[in-house]
Swiss-Prot record:
Source species taxonomy: Eukaryota, Metazoa, Chordata, Craniata, Vertebrata
Species whose genome carries this gene: Rattus norvegicus (Rat)
Gene3D superfamilies on file: 3.30.70.330
Segments forming domain RRM: 69-145
Compartments where found: Nucleus
Subunit organization: Interacts with SREK1IP1. Homodimer. Binds SFRS1, SFRS2, SFRS3 and SFRS6. Interacts with the spliceosome.
GO CC, one annotated term: spliceosomal complex
Record's protein name: Splicing regulatory glutamine/lysine-rich protein 1
Stretches assigned to coiled coil: none
Length: 494
């Protein structure tokens, strides 16, 4: 597969010498490769003996000469080698007519076809086989195909192309003039259009008159007509090369203009593509920034939710601590109430115990009095002692026991009332506690009085112990007086 590449297609032969062309391209011969001396020798005999490959049967006989004059050049670096370099390189061998690059540009290696003007330069080119061209050795061989050239244009097609090119040139000129001077440009276009139409009409009228004259002359003078025809043919022959030259020049100009326009279009398209790519990149960056902003907002919401959860947990912990503090206060208040109750109990001994103490102290006092009376009175008859030693009547004893039981009942009722009031006061608030303490002050005074009584009773007990020892001594003697018994009974009643 052969394909034309922009800037590397069919190249015409420049008129300058090969060495000056190489220097103008900036390609040094030393970098391209060493040229063998046999290739530069014009009198080559051995190279002409290289056999040419047989041609295919279906080859066009008109292209056989072109095939014999073309050479296949392979193992070219697709990134560095160009058709201009090959043209300048093979000009050293002979006159080069066409150079065509072939192969895929994306592949690392490519190949080319070089057509020489003379068949004698082909064996010289074959001598370059293996020569280093750049960084690779060349592979040169006879070609089996001719270079495909564009078809030659007919005069009608060339005229159409010229008209199209002229139209484009006129449009460009009008556009430029309108851009620079819109008003003056419009007036000039009008004048130019009138002058052109005037000249066209003149040319048409002159041609018509000339043809009429020729017809009249042909009728009368055939010889002069033949002479004029021959003259016209000569003029046409003389004018034809000028026309051809002008057409070729116009073609070249049109091609150069079309190329420049194509280049401008390509540059404009490239600029537009770059702008579009930049806009796309900007849009992508904006989308990325938006996504980042969304992620940041989500993270902020999550952080807020976490903070709310932490605050809720802290509130719960505070509530728990407050509940614990309340429970601790309640426990402390209960413990304080229990301690107070215990202190009260320890301070207030049971009245039964006090009454028993009093009864004991009264009995002791009786015994002491008896012992004293026995010691004072003289020892009389035994009959009197027996009468005094007799116990009192059972009726008196029953009355005393009933009084003692009533007093015990009253004391127990009072204690129960005090306990109930203390429990109610402990359940009330601190304000109630202060009131309870105020109410308990008289009770404490009573307890202090009871403690004083208990201290008095202890002193009396100590005295009773001393008296009991004396009474025990007196009982051995068996002395007692009735007057002392009466005093004892009155003390018990009290």
């Amino acid at each position: 597969m052969t394909s034309l590449v922009p800037g590397a297609g069919l190249l015409p032969i420049p008129t300058s010498s090969p060495l000056t062309a190489v220097s103008s391209l900036g390609v040094s011969l030393s970098s391209l490769g060493a040229i063998p001396a046999a290739a530069l020798d014009p009198n080559i005999t051995a190279l002409g003996e290289i056999p040419q490959p047989p041609l295919m049967g279906n080859v066009d006989p008109s292209k056989i000469d072109e095939i014999r004059r073309t050479v296949y050049v392979g193992n070219l670096n697709s990134q560095t080698t160009t058709a201009d370099q090959l043209l300048e390189f093979f000009k050293q061998v002979g006159e080069v007519k066409f150079v065509r690059m072939a192969g895929d540009e994306t592949q690392p290696t490519r190949f080319a076809f070089v057509e020489f003007a003379d068949q004698n330069s082909v064996p010289r080119a074959l001598a370059f086989n293996g020569v280093m061209f750049g960084d690779r050795p060349l592979k040169i061989n006879h070609s089996n195909n001719a270079i495909v050239k564009p078809p030659e244009m007919t005069p009608q097609a060339a005229a159409k192309e010229l008209e199209e090119v002229m139209k484009r040139v006129r449009e460009a000129q009008s556009f430029i003039s309108a851009a620079i001077e819109p008003e003056s440009g419009k007036s000039n276009e009008r004048k130019g259009g009138r002058s052109r139409s005037h000249t066209r009409s003149k040319s048409r009228s002159s041609s018509k008159s000339h043809s009429r004259r020729k017809r009249s002359q042909s009728k009368h003078r055939s010889r002069s007509h033949n002479r004029s025809r021959s003259r016209q043919k000569d003029r046409a022959r003389s004018k034809s090369p000028h026309k051809k030259r002008s057409k070729s020049r116009e073609r070249r100009k049109s091609r150069s203009r079309s190329r420049s326009r194509d280049k401008r279009k390509d540059t404009r398209e490239k600029v537009k593509e770059r702008v579009k790519e930049r806009e796309r990149e900007k849009e992508k960056e904006r989308e990325k920034e938006r996504e980042k902003d969304k992620e940041r907002g989500k993270n902020k919401d999550k952080d807020r939710e976490k903070e709310k959860d932490h605050e809720k947990e802290r509130d719960k912990e505070k509530e728990k601590e407050q509940d614990k503090d309340k429970e601790r206060e309640k426990d402390r208040s209960k413990e304080a109430d229990e301690k107070r109750k215990k202190e009260k109990k320890s301070r207030t001994p049971p009245r039964s115990y006090n009454s028993s103490r009093r009864s004991r102290s009264a009995s002791r006092e009786r015994r002491r009095r008896r012992s004293r009376s026995s010691s004072r009175s003289p020892r009389t008859s035994k009959t009197i002692k027996r009468k005094s030693s007799r116990s009192p009547s059972p009726r008196g004893r029953n009355k005393k026991e009933k009084k003692r039981e009533k007093e015990r009942d009253h004391i127990s009722d009072r204690r129960e009332r005090e306990r109930s009031t203390s429990t109610k006061k402990s359940s009330s608030d601190r304000d109630g506690k202060e009131k309870v303490e105020k109410t308990n002050t008289p009770v404490k005074e009573k307890e202090h009085s009871k403690e004083a009584d208990s201290t008095v009773s202890t002193d009396a007990d100590e005295k009773d112990t001393a008296r009991t020892e004396e009474e025990s001594k007196a009982q051995h003697n068996g002395n007692c007086q009735p007057h002392e018994e009466r005093l004892c009974s009155t003390a018990d009643a009290v």
